[in-house]
């Protein structure tokens, strides 16, 4: 019996060595998801950050048989593998957030951000 595939939207963001870290994250997401599609990447100014470096942001839509909880754990593991730490110095090597799992939206504040509203149109 085939497992149910769930449609997901994941946001990618980085404010440190942005292009390299985003490329690493994309490679990992291509391995993780079935039919991964990526938007273009856009630069944004930091919001509520102690650092002034711009963020590179991108969205990804794909499908997975993983449950929601397991998918979130795997995303956090990918962040660690790329070099993310949870210190408070404002460096975000990579941030992978599950914005939507099937029809359930997460990170509701992010849905109001201009870059999400712009990039979601590319999916």
What are these regions (language model features)?
Residues 17-21:
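Short N-terminal binding/cap micro-motifs at the start of the first secondary-structure element
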Residues 4-9:
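Extreme N-terminal starter segment of soluble prokaryotic enzymes
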